[in-house]
């Protein structure tokens, strides 16, 4: 199963960031593309940053997506699908990424 844009998956981000929920931000890849996905990680340890965007969803613990954590990883590190964010939440996170990157 290829992770889809707007879905939240448990992903293995390695020893430093561990396994945690992450929002899939990239479009699905095709057979000719590299099997990579771009994700934004979710945290429950908030610091009060303007780049921590809180999201309420039944499949997530209280916390926020950290738009400073844009990361591209191999799709095989997406372990299991948790659910899909609403279009409103997805737009809010996209806007946060634009602010962070000044796009």
List each language-model region with its residue ranges.
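Conserved functional hotspots at enzyme active or ligand-binding sites that engage polyanionic ligands
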Residues: 1-103
């Amino acid at each position: 199963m290829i992770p889809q844009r707007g879905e939240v998956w448990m992903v293995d981000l390695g020893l430093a960031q561990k396994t945690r929920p992450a929002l899939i931000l990239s479009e699905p890849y095709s057979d000719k593309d590299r099997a990579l996905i771009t994700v934004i990680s979710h945290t429950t340890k908030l610091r009060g940053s303007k780049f921590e965007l809180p999201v309420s969803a039944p499949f997530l613990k209280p916390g926020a997506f950290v738009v400073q954590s844009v990361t591209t990883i191999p799709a095989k590190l997406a372990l299991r699908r948790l659910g899909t964010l609403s279009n409103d939440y997805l737009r809010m996170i996209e806007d946060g990424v634009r602010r962070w990157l000044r796009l």
